[in-house]
Amino acid sequence: MDSSLEQHRLEINENREHWRRKPVLRRVYAQFYRDIAARINPANPGFVVELGSGMGNVKEHIPHCITTDVFPNPWLDRVENAYGLTFGDQTVGHLILFDVWHHLRYPGEALREFSRVLVQRGRLVIFEPAMGFLGRYVFGTFHHEPLGLENDIEWTGGEDFRPDKAGYYAAQGNASRIFTGEEFKSCLRDWEIKEIKHYSGLAYLASGGFRGPQLYPTVLLPFFNSVDSLLSKFSSLSSRMLVVLDKK
C-alpha cells in the first residue's frame, strides 16, 4: 500500500477511538449529516454512494448509502477510486463527498467520472472546509493539511493520467476557490449549482475536532448551535460549506 494511503488508514483507526470518546463530536457531525441527508432527492433513481467514507458514519443517517474508500475496511461496503469508479454508466443517483473534495488533485478528472456514473439530473453533494475568516484562521493555523490557496489547481491530469497514479493530495481551500470564485465557472458548465450553504462551524471548531481539546462542555452544544445560526448568516466568517451540484 502507498505510504500516504497507509497513513490515512492509520488516521481513520485513530479517529474511530476519538469518535468513541467524544460525544459532542458525534452530535456535531450528526447535524452535518442530517443536512446532507436532507439533500437526497427521492425522485432520483440509482444508488446513493459516499466516496471516502472513512468511518462509515453516513449510514446512521442514510442507511441505504453505499460506503466506499480507497482501501478496504470491514465496516465499508466496497473499495472505490474517485477517478475510476466501478459503477456502470448512469447507475448512481447521488454521490456524497464529505471532506473528500480537497483531496482530489485533478477535480476535472473526478467530475468527468462522476458525470459518467450519475443519472440525468443526478446529484453531487459536497461538504468541505470553507475559507471564511474562521476557516482560514483555524484550518490554516491548527490543521495539518495545507490550505493551498496560493497553489495552482490542476484541473486535469493530462493525456497520460491514470486513476491509480494520482497520489496523496490535500488543499483545504479548493472548494471555496472552485465553487465561489469566477476562475472555474466555465469548468462547471455541465453542472448546475443548486445550493451553496455556509456554516460558521463554531460548535465544531470549539469541539476540538478529532485531535484537539474540547473547549466547552457538551451540555453547552445548544448554545453554540444558536451562535452558529447567527454567525452562519455571514459567509465571510465561515469554516464549513455544503455544495449541491446537479448534473445537467
Please provide the spans of the model-predicted regions:
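Conserved N-terminal segment of class I S-adenosyl-L-methionine
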Residues: M1-Y83, M241
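A conserved beta-strand element that flanks and buttresses the S-adenosyl-L-methionine
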Residues: I96
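Acceptor-substrate binding/catalytic loop of class I
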Residues: K165-E183
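A C-terminal cap/extension of S-adenosyl-L-methionine-dependent methyltransferases
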Residues: E182-S186, K194-K248
